[in-house]
Amino acid sequence: MTFRSLLQEMRSRPHRVVHAAASTANSSDPFSWSELPEELLREILIRVETVDGGDWPSRRNVVACAGVCRSWRILTKEIVAVPEFSSKLTFPISLKQSGPRDSLVQCFIKRNRNTQSYHLYLGLTTSLTDNGKFLLAASKLKRATCTDYIISLRSDDISKRSNAYLGRMRSNFLGTKFTVFDGSQTGAAKMQKSRSSNFIKVSPRVPQGSYPIAHISYELNVLGSRGPRRMRCIMDTIPMSIVESRGVVASTSISSFSSRSSPVFRSHSKPLRSNSASCSDSGNNLGDPPLVLSNKAPRWHEQLRCWCLNFHGRVTVASVKNFQLVAVSDCEAGQTSERIILQFGKVGKDMFTMDYGYPISAFQAFAICLSSFETRIACE
């Protein structure tokens, strides 16, 4: 059913609001989409979400409806569910919202060795060879004492000064510890509204990208024994009780996705602890301890003579970069859950799969996977 026929069908229904609006409308004036009655508009958007609200590229129709005007945008945000419940990535803000609870969002990463860049795509089919929909891009910047990974919404504009800037990840000198920074401002940031536009400007006195949201550490292999890498991720903004009680993770509101410079691309969760990368320091007396992720223990395959994990067909090439992360339920005892929150693996020379789920977001999962690309001889 076309959009024109849909409107004709809705107008033919006996509805007093529609007739009232039609009686007062001037036929000589051009029709304004913002003047549609709310009841009619809601039914239209619900049908668009139902019919064309599947996977990409058909989902672009939902995004197009949100860009018509303010009234359409407000209703669209009420109708479209967050990825946690819909398993769909619709707007840019979805990349900083928690993944689905009962499944994993299947993505893949393409590496460009020449430009030291990494592109994240959403898998459109179950095949590992589809083109996918572009989600995020990252660029590797080597410095004297560390390495930075700049993460952006645009592949052609990866910089901290860009409106598409999401955040960054910085490693230490050895490449064994990483800190993920969100591009949002802290509570001390001053927000100013421009007189000439609706864009929100941030005071330059507060540097961007200085808000840590996760710490990643790789265990040093001082004895030189061969085996899979051991990593641990402390998610500063996600409490451990979220996984245990199946609660709701505080995430960015979708109400402001209309502005490029607004916090549409920013998360507003507050850190639960001070900067630390050890499990023993994850607890605090001020509230719930943060979520800790650790490698799922692999098993040794005697016939293949290698360490094995069940990726359910999503990984085809053996590599030390491959991993599956699960929640650590008891830091002191080292107990872990069985539910996989993030898995990453190699399927080609410069092709990797990335599947993530609740309670982490695509941005957090992408940053964790980027740390696996860093060369660290002490951990091999």
Swiss-Prot record:
Pathway recorded for this protein: Protein modification; protein ubiquitination
An example Gene Ontology biological process: regulation of DNA-templated transcription
Induction: During imbibition of seeds.
Pfam families (UniProt xref): F-box, Tub
Residue span of region Disordered: 258-283
Keywords: Abscisic acid signaling pathway, Ubl conjugation pathway
UniProt keyword Transmembrane present: no
Molecular-function GO terms, alphabetical: transcription cis-regulatory region binding
GO cellular component: plasma membrane
InterPro entries from the UniProt entry: F-box-like_dom_sf, F-box_dom, Tubby-like_C, Tubby_C, Tubby_C_CS
Domain F-box: 30-76
Polar residues biased stretches: 272-283
Family: Belongs to the TUB family.
Subunit structure: Part of a SCF (SKP1-cullin-F-box) protein ligase complex. Interacts with SKP1A/ASK1 and XERICO.
Function: Component of SCF(ASK-cullin-F-box) E3 ubiquitin ligase complexes, which may mediate the ubiquitination and subsequent proteasomal degradation of target proteins. Confers sensitivity to ABA during seed germination and early seedling development.
Protein name: Tubby-like F-box protein 9
